[in-house]
A protein has these predicted regions:
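Membrane-spanning helices that line or support transport/gating and their immediate boundary helices
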Residues: 191, 195-196
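Non-transmembrane alpha-helical coiled-coil
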Residues: 97-157
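Beta-strand-loop-alpha "switch" segments that mediate conformational coupling across diverse proteins
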Residues: 1-8, 69-112
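Short, charged, surface-exposed interaction patches
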Residues: 60-64, 68-73, 114-118, 122-123
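Interfacial amphipathic helix/helix-coil modules
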Residues: 143-187, 198
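Extracytoplasmic
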Residues: 1-69, 73-77, 130-133, 153-155, ...
Length: 198
C-alpha cells in the first residue's frame, strides 16, 4: 500500500473528503482538515497522529472504509470495489488496486522463478546422473513455462470480467431509509415524552 498505491492517490481524496458535486465533478474537502486553496493540511491531531495523515492511518481508512473484496462461493470470482463519494475516484482507485496487485505478484513470482532457474541450472551442471538431470530438466521446463505466463499478460492475478465503471446510482447513504427511520424514531420519542408528562 505504502509503496504502490498511496503514492498514486491524492491523499485528501481519502482522508479529508466531505462531499462530491456531481454537476461540476468537484470534490469538496472538509475545511477543518484540508485547505483546498493552499493545498495544505490544517487538521487538529493528537499523538500518535501527525498533521499530514501517515501511511498507517491512511491504510486503516482505505482498508476499513473504502476497499471491499468479496468472493462468490459458487464461481470463485473475486469482486473488488471501492466506496467513495466520487464515482470517478472510485473507478480510478479500483483500476489502480487491480494494476498494483498484478504488478506486485508478477515481480515477486518472476524473481522467484529466476532464482529457481539459476539454482536448477547450477545443479544441472554439477550432476552427471542422467535420471537427476532429467528431473532437473523437467523442473526447468516448468519454470520456463511460468516465466512465459508471467510475461504474457498484464492481468497476472486479476483480470476484468466487468471492468470498473463510473456508477450512475449512489451506493450510500440511502436517504429515503434515513428519512423514514428518523420520522419513525421521532414519532416514538414524541409519544414517549407525551406519556411521561401525563
Amino acid at each position: 500500500f505504502t509503496d504502490n498505491i498511496l503514492p498514486n492517490i491524492f491523499l485528501p481524496d481519502l482522508m479529508a473528503i466531505k462531499s462530491w458535486d456531481p454537476r461540476t465533478n468537484t470534490i469538496i474537502y472538509n475545511k477543518k482538515d484540508f485547505n483546498q486553496d493552499t493545498q495544505t493540511w490544517i487538521r487538529d491531531f493528537g499523538y500518535p497522529q501527525t498533521q499530514i495523515p501517515s501511511a498507517q492511518e491512511s491504510f486503516r481508512v482505505f482498508m476499513s472504509e473504502k476497499l471491499n473484496f468479496s468472493q462468490n462461493k459458487d464461481t470463485g470470482f473475486i469482486t473488488i470495489s471501492i466506496k467513495h463519494q466520487s464515482p470517478y475516484v472510485a473507478q480510478a482507485w479500483t483500476e489502480l488496486v487491480v494494476k498494483e496487485i498484478n504488478y506486485f505478484f508478477r515481480v515477486k513470482d518472476k524473481a522467484e522463478a529466476q532464482t529457481s532457474m539459476i539454482f536448477l541450472n547450477n545443479q544441472m551442471a554439477k550432476t552427471s546422473l542422467a535420471e537427476i538431470r532429467q528431473v532437473i530438466a523437467q523442473l526447468l521446463q516448468q519454470k520456463t513455462q511460468k516465466m512465459t505466463l508471467i510475461e504474457a499478460s498484464n492481468f497476472y492475478v486479476f483480470d476484468y470480467i466487468d471492468p470498473p465503471a463510473v456508477m450512475e446510482q449512489k451506493a450510500e447513504p440511502q436517504r429515503a431509509i434515513i428519512v423514514v427511520l428518523g420520522a419513525f424514531l421521532g414519532s416514538i420519542l414524541g409519544m414517549f415524552i407525551v406519556l411521561i408528562r401525563r
